[in-house]
Each structure stands twice: as structure tokens, then as C-alpha cells.
Amino acid sequence: MHLEYPYSVHHSIIPDNLCDEIIEQGEKLIKWDGLERRSGITHGFLMKAISSIVNTANENNGWNYVTENHDRMYYQSIGWHQYHKWRMNNKSKPSINPEKMNKISFMLSLNQVDIDYHGCYFELAYGAPWTQNYLNRFDELKKGTLIVFPSFLYYRFSPVMGGDRKIISGNLIGPAFA
């Protein structure tokens, strides 16, 4: 599926002081049980604000996906030489309503590139990313910037070359595509 507007960027939409508070609380939440990382964020007001922006992007970009709810938001701290391989979110089941599917994904940058971390570029791709069919490489995302994209797009983070990148990610969910 080719989209005229495959993503939406909302620069510095979340204030710096709120980003700092989320980082502080997120660092306290990260737990590792040896099998998986547990780092769910449950800020109701934050999820409402993000859901509103995501729903507006859904409409304004002409995606018009039916969404019913949001899945959990996850806080992540990506450290030195860590990265995310190419992935897409619509292949995994939502943790809250596994009978639904992830429809729209988002990533909120909580700290500042070239001050708090270096590298760790966010990249989006159509289809098989190894064909280098990139949509965009976001290498200068300011603190508080939100990127919204359909969950069937591939995305990744390149390696962190210094510092720690802090983000929140999540999905709006809905019925499976017909």
C-alpha cells in the first residue's frame, strides 16, 4: 500500500519539563526479569494528548484507519551501541486487547540529539527495508517531537554512538483490516 503521506512529524509538541519528568519516572519503571523488559508508562493525561494528536494525523493524512483504543506506552532508554533492528508493529498483538491489531504507531523523543545522545537515527521504510526503500531518516529530532506512522511500516533505530536516547513508543489499536 502506497500512502501519499506515510508519516507525520510534530516538532517539540511536548514541553521540555514534561519530557524530563517522564524520563525520571520512566527510569524508575524499567524492570528486567531475565526474559523481557517491563517499562509501561501509564500517564493518562499524556496518553490522551498523544491519542488526540495521533487521531488528528490519522484523519489529516487520509489514512482514516478505524481505531478504538490505545495499547500501553513503553519507555525506552537506548544506550551505547544499542539499536533496534528493522521491525513493524502490526505483526505483534496488542498487550491490552490481543484480539485487535496495532494500526497506528508513534514515537516520542524525550531528550535532545547532539546534547544527550549521538547517533540513534530513527528510520522508516516501505516494504523490505534491506532494499533501501527508505521513506526518511530522522537524524535531528528535537526533544518533545512526536512521529506518527502506520504500524505496517518498517522502522528502526541506528546505533547510539554516545549518551542514551530516551523515547516513549506506543500504538493505537483497532479491528483487523478487512
Model-inferred region functions:
Residues 1-148, 152-178:
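Fe(II)/2-oxoglutarate oxygenase catalytic core
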